[in-house]
Amino acid sequence: MNIRKNSKSVSKRFKVTSNKLILYKPASKSHLQEKKTVSRKKRLCRVKRIKVVDSKSIKLRYMF
Protein backbone atom coordinates (compact mmCIF):
# COMPACT_ATOMS: atom_id res chain seq x y z
CA MET A 1 0.00 0.00 0.00
CA ASN A 2 1.42 3.36 -1.02
CA ILE A 3 1.51 6.19 1.47
CA ARG A 4 0.75 9.70 0.21
CA LYS A 5 3.22 12.27 1.45
CA ASN A 6 3.17 16.03 1.69
CA SER A 7 5.43 17.99 -0.57
CA LYS A 8 8.18 19.16 1.80
CA SER A 9 8.67 22.46 0.01
CA VAL A 10 4.97 23.29 0.26
CA SER A 11 4.72 22.32 3.92
CA LYS A 12 7.65 24.62 4.77
CA ARG A 13 6.32 27.63 2.86
CA PHE A 14 2.57 27.54 3.56
CA LYS A 15 0.32 27.08 6.58
CA VAL A 16 -3.35 26.09 6.51
CA THR A 17 -5.60 27.68 9.14
CA SER A 18 -8.62 26.09 10.79
CA ASN A 19 -10.85 27.96 8.31
CA LYS A 20 -8.93 26.31 5.42
CA LEU A 21 -7.19 29.56 4.42
CA ILE A 22 -3.64 29.20 3.10
CA LEU A 23 -1.11 31.69 4.47
CA TYR A 24 2.46 32.48 3.46
CA LYS A 25 5.23 34.99 4.15
CA PRO A 26 6.54 36.89 1.14
CA ALA A 27 10.17 36.67 0.07
CA SER A 28 12.86 39.41 -0.05
CA LYS A 29 12.99 40.19 3.68
CA SER A 30 16.06 38.16 4.64
CA HIS A 31 18.85 40.38 3.27
CA LEU A 32 19.75 43.59 1.36
CA GLN A 33 17.49 45.76 3.50
CA GLU A 34 19.41 49.04 3.34
CA LYS A 35 17.94 50.06 0.01
CA LYS A 36 14.37 49.07 0.92
CA THR A 37 12.04 51.68 2.40
CA VAL A 38 10.54 51.28 5.86
CA SER A 39 7.04 50.87 4.48
CA ARG A 40 8.21 48.15 2.10
CA LYS A 41 9.94 46.24 4.91
CA LYS A 42 6.79 46.46 7.06
CA ARG A 43 4.72 45.17 4.17
CA LEU A 44 7.10 42.23 3.67
CA CYS A 45 6.75 41.21 7.35
CA ARG A 46 3.02 40.63 7.09
CA VAL A 47 1.52 37.21 6.54
CA LYS A 48 -0.52 37.07 3.34
CA ARG A 49 -3.28 34.86 1.99
CA ILE A 50 -2.98 32.84 -1.18
CA LYS A 51 -5.23 33.84 -4.07
CA VAL A 52 -8.14 31.53 -4.82
CA VAL A 53 -6.71 30.68 -8.24
CA ASP A 54 -3.53 29.23 -6.73
CA SER A 55 -5.11 27.53 -3.73
CA LYS A 56 -6.24 24.40 -5.56
CA SER A 57 -2.75 23.40 -6.70
CA ILE A 58 -1.32 24.01 -3.22
CA LYS A 59 -4.04 21.98 -1.51
CA LEU A 60 -3.22 19.00 -3.72
CA ARG A 61 0.36 19.02 -2.46
CA TYR A 62 -0.51 19.89 1.17
CA MET A 63 -2.83 17.13 2.31
CA PHE A 64 -3.56 17.93 5.93
Swiss-Prot record:
Keywords: Chloroplast, Plastid, Ribonucleoprotein, Ribosomal protein
Source organism superkingdom: Eukaryota
InterPro entries named in the record: Ribosomal_bL35, Ribosomal_bL35-like, Ribosomal_bL35_CS, Ribosomal_bL35_sf
Swiss-Prot/TrEMBL GO biological process terms: translation
One Pfam family here: Ribosomal_L35p
Subcellular location: Plastid, Chloroplast
Molecular function as annotated in GO: structural constituent of ribosome
GO CC entries: chloroplast; ribonucleoprotein complex; ribosome
Family the UniProt entry places it in: Belongs to the bacterial ribosomal protein bL35 family.
HAMAP family: Ribosomal_bL35
Protein's name according to its UniProt entry: Large ribosomal subunit protein bL35c
Native source species: Cyanidium caldarium
Gene expressing this chain: rpl35
